[in-house]
Amino acid sequence: MALDKSIVVNFTSRLFADELAALQSKIGSVLPLGDCHRLQNIQALGLGCVCSRETSPDYIQIMQYLSKCTLAVLEEVRPDSLRLTRMDPSDNLQIKNVYAPFFQWDSNTQLAVLPPFFSRKDSTIVLESNGFDLVFPMVVPQQLGHAILQQLLVYHIYSKISAGAPDDVNMAELDLYTTNVSFMGRTYRLDVDNTDPRTALRVLDDLSMYLCILSALVPRGCLRLLTALVRHDRHPLTEVFEGVVPDEVTRIDLDQLSVPDDITRMRVMFSYLQSLSSIFNLGPRLHVYAYSAETLAASCWYSPR
């Protein structure tokens, strides 16, 4: 007997006609839920609990919520309720590409479920009948998700520098290179204007510090090996890195090597790498094996990590 994975979300009031039509256009989309219970209320649906209109978005906090919550596919919309199908690991699913902005999917690709990086407004259906904003996540190709996170991290680092020393950062240049991403010939602007620098992306403060610490934790033996390979073996792969080895690396006293010290460095470095990977692995993921550009429907299987 097949396991019933249906989740029913009841509204507090019947939907208006335009709200009903807007939600029906989103059938096939992925929505987060606070838990996996069969019957839930509307307050548990969507990203409104971590991405409300009253607060500035903290995208890393939203990503952490997406990694812990229950995900489901919107299957049916009625005037008084929604029906969704819970997504379990390795499940085969049918979803649709009904997100704004629109990014083309294709077969044999990986999709990431991410916060609404480009516009909370465009990812929200306002249900005035229920006094509730239903905020949808984005489902985008994984390589685009990586590009977004990389640019947000650089933007945040330089914004912090500018807060302490405004003359040290060319904000026009920072805006040009970090607030826009290109994908398949089109350019999209990230929603960084509405973030509060005092709270938004606060987890990236730790991540930025982790990156700085990692640069100091690289075992000295690794640096010695790097310089030896670049200078002598001339392997094609090491030639790629020859031009980007910082000058300070060549000035380190590599003759003072210590195996116990390098073991400690390696152990701590792995600890910080695991902290970084918990953010940057872009879980959860959807592995698409069939996609129709005409119907925007995709067949995929689900991986929480």
Curated annotation (Swiss-Prot):
A molecular-function term among this protein's GO annotations: structural molecule activity
Cellular component GO terms held in the UniProt record: host cell nucleus; viral capsid
InterPro entries linked to this entry: Herpes_capsid_2
Main location as per UniProt: virion
UniProt keyword Lipoprotein present: no
Domain of life per record: Viruses
Assembly description: Interacts with TRX1 and major capisd protein/MCP.
HAMAP family for the chain: HSV_TRX2 (MF_04019)
The protein's name: Triplex capsid protein 2
Taxonomic lineage: Viruses, Duplodnaviria, Heunggongvirae, Peploviricota, Herviviricetes
